[in-house]
């Protein structure tokens, strides 16, 4: 009898109740917009960043403008640059924003069946702009942004915060991510993770992911519930 009770308890603890979504490059095709906004802001301040540099520094490593300036020995004002970039990015969202393939259908499929959280390292205004533009804010019980935690990805803080606010154990969650920094963060948080690479992240190291899928269209309830 005790063995049956223990087995039932372990099944419940491991049951997937909650899905934690990344935003940029996973649900929304916004990495190109972030890149364009940084390029325009830096150009206006007499500097330049290539697409490849942006992909490596921001998307892969999760570093920010302050580190980028410091590494190059520049004397630019990171606060002014970030403000310029933010204004331009929000402008671009109004005209260029689009969802990633399969994103809206997946959210609709999971909405009434799992608890959903959004965990994005971006600033709140950028997150709110994307959610409003795509009309998807109502899908999420919990939204955690980069200003809500001490350290952003690849640190695990943002996923741990999302799980805690959902009232779920790490073993009951699955993270959906498109970038190496997010995969590392999920791994450090002890949460299973499915990687869905995009154009900017196909060359990333996804060896820590529980599974790799080519598109959000491959994510199903059956896949989530049977993920080992």
How does the language model describe each region?
Residues 48, 115-116, 192:
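Residue-level detector of anion-binding/catalytic polar loops
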């Amino acid at each position: 009898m005790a063995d049956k009770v223990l087995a039932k308890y372990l099944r419940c603890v491991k049951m997937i109740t909650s899905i934690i979504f990344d935003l940029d490059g996973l649900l929304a095709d916004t990495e190109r917009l972030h890149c364009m906004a940084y390029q325009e802001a830096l150009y206006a301040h007499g500097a330049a960043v290539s697409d490849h540099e942006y992909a490596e520094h921001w998307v892969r490593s999760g570093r920010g403008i302050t580190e980028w300036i410091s590494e190059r020995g520049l004397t630019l004002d990171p606060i002014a640059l970030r403000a310029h970039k933010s204004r331009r990015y929000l402008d671009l969202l109004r005209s260029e924003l689009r969802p990633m393939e399969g994103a809206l259908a997946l959210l609709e499929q999971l909405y009434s069946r799992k608890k959903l959280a959004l965990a994005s390292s971006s600033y709140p205004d950028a997150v709110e702009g994307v959610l409003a533009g795509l009309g998807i804010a109502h899908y999420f019980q919990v939204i955690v942004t980069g200003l809500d935690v001490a350290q952003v990805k690849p640190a695990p803080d943002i996923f741990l915060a999302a799980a805690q606010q959902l009232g779920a154990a790490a073993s009951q969650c699955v993270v959906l991510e498109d970038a190496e920094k997010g995969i590392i963060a999920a791994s450090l948080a002890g949460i299973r993770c499915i990687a869905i690479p995009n154009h900017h992240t196909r060359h990333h190291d996804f060896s820590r992911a529980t599974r790799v899928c080519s598109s959000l269209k491959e994510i199903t309830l059956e896949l989530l519930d049977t993920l080992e």
